[in-house]
Amino acid sequence: MNQPIYTELPPANFPGEFPVYRRNSSFSRLIPCLTETWGDLPLKVDDSEDMVIYTLLKDALNVGWSPFNFSAGEVKSEQREEEIVVSPAETTAAPAAELPRGRHYRGVRRRPWGKFAAEIRDPAKNGARVWLGTYETDEEAAIAYDKAAYRMRGSKAHLNFPHRIGLNEPEPVRVTAKRRASPEPASSSENSSPKRRRKAVATEKSEAVEVESKSNVLQTGCQVELLTRRHQLLVS
């Protein structure tokens, strides 16, 4: 018997499965040979491998089988569907960008009208607040706080500008209630009431009349003196 009983396709073409067989017409010619010499086969009952061979031969006699002529190109592995992961949409909107804020200095508070107040807690007075003043800018108020804190706590003080302590800068100017310049005299006379302006005009006129009368008196006195001297010269 030169023809093999069965052939299998390579296992790679059938991953995870047994090969499929069908009945072959040429196999029927082997049946008399197998049936006549069935009892002469050297198979042992207590050998597991012999029992496997026995089972295969028995099935071949009862059914008859041979593998299909599958080509490697006909067998195609199923493409695995790609899992599409959809990221959940963001339900919450991005937080709105905060408006930029100025730097917050230690001991400085912004007043409702736009100025900046400086204050400090005095440890000698059980942490009571000490008012340092109101300033035009937050930097001036921070400098005022630094100077007061350095006087109270020395090198242990937490400062806004520690690098400016040794510069001996002048004290920042506080904002006071009366910082307006005094009005000029000319502008005061222009902004006065009509009665005051009439009174000022009358005063100027009276002063002019008085000066004129004085000049007339002086002129008359000079003329009398000249006439007296002439009379004396004629008599002599």
From Swiss-Prot:
GO terms for biological process: defense response; ethylene-activated signaling pathway. Residues 104-162 bind DNA. Residues 183-192 have a biased composition (Low complexity). Expressed in roots and at low levels in buds and leaves. Highly expressed in cell culture, especially during the exponential phase. Residues 201-213 have a biased composition (Basic and acidic residues). Induction: Highly and transiently expressed in tobacco mosaic virus (TMV) infected leaves. Induced by methyl-jasmonate (MeJA), and by ethephon (ethylene-releasing compound) in buds and to lower extent in leaves. Quickly and transiently induced by salicylic acid (SA). Strongly induced by wounding, independently of ethylene, and through a de-novo-protein-synthesis-independent regulation. Wound induction is reduced by MeJA. GO terms for cellular component: nucleus. Keywords: Activator, DNA-binding, Ethylene signaling pathway, Nucleus, Plant defense, Transcription, Transcription regulation. Residues 163-214 are annotated as: Disordered. Probably acts as a transcriptional activator and may be involved in disease resistance pathways. Binds to the GCC-box pathogenesis-related promoter element. Involved in the regulation of gene expression by stress factors and by components of stress signal transduction pathways mediated by ethylene, that seems to depend on a protein kinase cascade and to be influenced by methyl-jasmonate. The AP2/ERF domain binds specifically to the 5'-GCCGCC-3' motif. The affinity of this binding is higher if the seventh amino-acid of this domain is basic. This is Ethylene-responsive transcription factor 1.
